[in-house]
A protein has these predicted regions:
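Amphipathic alpha-helical segments of tetratricopeptide repeats
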Residues: 3-11, 45-51, 87-88, 149
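"A position-specific structural signal for the A-helix of alpha-solenoid helical repeats
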Residues: 18, 23-25, 32, 65-67, ...
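Single-residue signature of alpha-solenoid repeat helices
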Residues: 1-2, 39, 79, 140
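Residue-level recognition of tetratricopeptide repeat
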Residues: 9, 76, 120, 153-154
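Flexible helix-coil transition and linker loops at the boundaries of alpha-helical arrays
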Residues: 4-16, 51-56, 111-115
C-alpha cells in the first residue's frame, strides 16, 4: 500500500511502469510454480497499461513486456502488432541525429555524458528488448552487452545477461 498514491492526488499513474519488470518476473515465477491464474492476472495488468509519451520516457521497453505477456496469454496477433510498432520506434531511434538526448538534453547529461553515446546505448537496449520479445536471446544478449558497455548503469541489461548465463 505504501506504493499506492491516494486517488485524490491524481498522480502516480506512471510510477506503475517502474514496477513492470519486477511484476513480469514475478508472473513468470508464479507460472513456473503452477500459480497460473495469478501469473495471468499480472500479465493482464501489464497489458492493460496504456502507452503514452510519459510512460515511454519512464519505461521505453514497456511495449516489449506487453508483447511477451500477450503471447503468454495467447494473443499472438496483438503481440505481433506491438512488435512491429516497437521495431518502427527503434528504427526511428537509429536515425536520430539531434544535438541532445532525443531533442531535450537534461542539464545533468549535458555536463556529464556524451548525448550521442547515451542515444546509442538507449537504442541498443531497445533493440535488445525487441529481440527478447521476439524470443531471439542471442541477438538480445549481443545488443544488451553493447548497451551495457556504453552505459554501465543499465541494470536490466545486466540482469538479462546474467539470466542468459544461468
Amino acid at each position: 500500500q505504501a506504493l499506492c498514491y491516494p486517488e485524490s492526488l491524481n498522480t502516480g499513474a506512471w510510477n506503475g511502469a517502474l514496477q513492470v519488470p519486477v511484476q513480469f518476473k514475478l508472473a513468470d515465477t508464479l507460472a513456473m510454480l503452477g500459480e497460473t491464474k495469478e501469473a495471468e492476472n499480472l500479465w493482464r495488468a501489464i497489458c492493460a497499461m496504456g502507452q503514452d509519451a510519459i510512460l515511454e520516457s519512464v519505461l521505453p521497453e514497456l511495449g516489449c513486456y506487453q508483447i511477451v505477456a500477450l503471447r503468454r496469454l495467447g494473443h499472438e496477433a496483438e503481440a505481433e502488432r506491438l512488435q512491429k510498432r516497437h521495431e518502427s520506434r527503434v528504427a526511428q531511434m537509429q536515425l536520430a541525429r539531434d544535438s541532445g538526448y532525443y531533442q531535450a538534453t537534461p542539464f545533468f547529461i549535458s555536463y556529464c555524458e556524451d548525448a550521442a553515446l547515451q542515444r546509442s546505448a538507449a537504442t541498443s537496449w531497445q533493440q535488445a528488448m525487441g529481440y527478447w520479445a521476439a524470443g531471439k536471446m542471442n541477438e538480445a544478449c549481443a545488443h544488451a552487452l553493447h548497451a551495457l558497455k556504453q552505459d554501465p548503469t543499465l541494470q536490466y541489461a545486466r540482469f538479462m545477461l546474467e539470466e542468459a548465463e544461468s
